[in-house]
Amino acid sequence: MSGSSLRRVAVFGATGSIGASALDVIARHPERLRASVLSAGSKVDALLALCVLHRPAHAVIADAALYPALRDGLRAAGLTTQAHAGDQALDALAASDACDTVVAAIVGAAGLSSTLAAAAAGKRLLLANKESLVLAGELLTRTAAAAGAEIIPIDSEHSAIFQCLRSCDASRGVRRVILTASGGPFRGRQRAQLAEVTPAQAVAHPKWSMGPKISVDSATLMNKGLEVIEAHHLFGLPGEQIDVLVHPQSLVHSLVEFVDGSTLAQLGLPDMRTTLAVGLAWPERVESGVGGLDLLQQGRLDFEAPDTEAFPCLRLAWDALRAGGTAPAILNAANEVAVSAFLQGKVGFLAIPALVEHTLTTLQRQNADTLNALLFADAEARRTTERALAHHSLHA
């Protein structure tokens, strides 16, 4: 990107933590970045406040019932921002000339349609929505390749691998990639100690500032399992070439080991603004607001193997990747339902992997060659998991 060209950025999921980080970086570079489209699910007041601050051309509220509040709020603020509502508006704006870059930060399967629309339109796609790759990885990467869209991952682990691989023309010389995991707030606990974990404890992540769903996924290690599946799609690697190490300091974000014996790692403070700055300016580097890494002050870097007995979600994700087809979509949908039930206090922490495993073993995998097949598998997995919630034997 030349210094004179203005990159118009759509931030989908603008009111979430990733959206806030993206807008922070964008605001630091008004000469080269502009937030042209902002979207939110139902937080209309927060979206209006962001519109006043960033003055986008378009604002979208996913909940159509809130459209009048958005429209009237924009008018009352004296803004020329055009109001839209619903998923179809998101898809249309993702594909339109209102933006050339899309930050896909809508949590869950709800973000899939607009992500695919951006890919099909050949946009630069800053992908923070894990579920798009887990649910429809083959479809998304195929769509992006056909349209010439550029997918730049935003989560720290895949951004690290992206940066290591792009630093040299050596993608075919990769022996393995190693994703690092903080281990979450319950690292070191035995399985029996996890039964009494509360939602408040699970969302208190030791290193990263994240939303509640992804915080729980980090606590169960499902987050890392989803990232294994993501890495498979993003970098074309089989599961056997993707490893996971627990690294509690969260300073080494991932490593790439090459066939010549060398290993490249990307290090930095745990702050999403770094990876967003990489995606927004690549191949250039711009200031993100994040300080440098002081290794003397940090002191030490520790690594250990993940405990898949206490945290079986990581193993379940590898199982789903090996099974292929709709299995990852089933895994993801079951997990979304289970985590939601846990956050509402309906089930215990250990019910999350139990429910996911139940659904994964109950439903047969199918081919995943169309979006309809994937959405059907997603819906079927949600129904199966909801039914299983009634059985208290799974809730232990």
Swiss-Prot record:
Gene Ontology BP, a term: isopentenyl diphosphate biosynthetic process, methylerythritol 4-phosphate pathway involved in terpenoid biosynthetic process
Which residues does the annotation say bind 1-deoxy-D-xylulose 5-phosphate?
Answer: K130, S156, E157, S182, H205, S218, N223, K224, E227
User: Which purpose does this protein serve, as stated in its record?
Assistant: Catalyzes the NADPH-dependent rearrangement and reduction of 1-deoxy-D-xylulose-5-phosphate (DXP) to 2-C-methyl-D-erythritol 4-phosphate (MEP).
The EC number(s) attached to this protein equal 1.1.1.267
The entry assigns this protein to a family as follows: Belongs to the DXR family.
Q: Which Pfam families match?
A: DXP_redisom_C, DXP_reductoisom, DXPR_C
Residues passing through the membrane, by range: none
Please provide the record's keywords in A-Z order. Isoprene biosynthesis, Manganese, Metal-binding, NADP, Oxidoreductase
Could you say which cofactors this protein requires?
Answer: Mg(2+); Mn(2+)
Q: Which InterPro entries match?
A: DXP_reductoisomerase (IPR003821), DXP_reductoisomerase_C (IPR013644), DXP_reductoisomerase_N (IPR013512), DXPR_C (IPR026877), DXPR_C_sf (IPR036169), NAD(P)-bd_dom_sf (IPR036291)
Q: What is this protein called?
A: 1-deoxy-D-xylulose 5-phosphate reductoisomerase
Pathway involvement of the protein, from the record: Isoprenoid biosynthesis; isopentenyl diphosphate biosynthesis via DXP pathway; isopentenyl diphosphate from 1-deoxy-D-xylulose 5-phosphate: step 1/6
Q: Summarize where NADPH binds, as residue positions.
A: T15, G16, S17, I18, G41, N129, E131, G211
An example of a GO molecular function for this protein is:
NADPH binding
Positions that bind Mn(2+):
D155, E157, E227
HAMAP family (UniProt xref): DXP_reductoisom
Keyword Oxidoreductase on entry: yes
Which reaction does this enzyme catalyse, per its entry? Answer: 2-C-methyl-D-erythritol 4-phosphate + NADP(+) = 1-deoxy-D-xylulose 5-phosphate + NADPH + H(+)
**Organism taxonomic ancestry:** Bacteria, Pseudomonadati, Pseudomonadota, Gammaproteobacteria, Lysobacterales
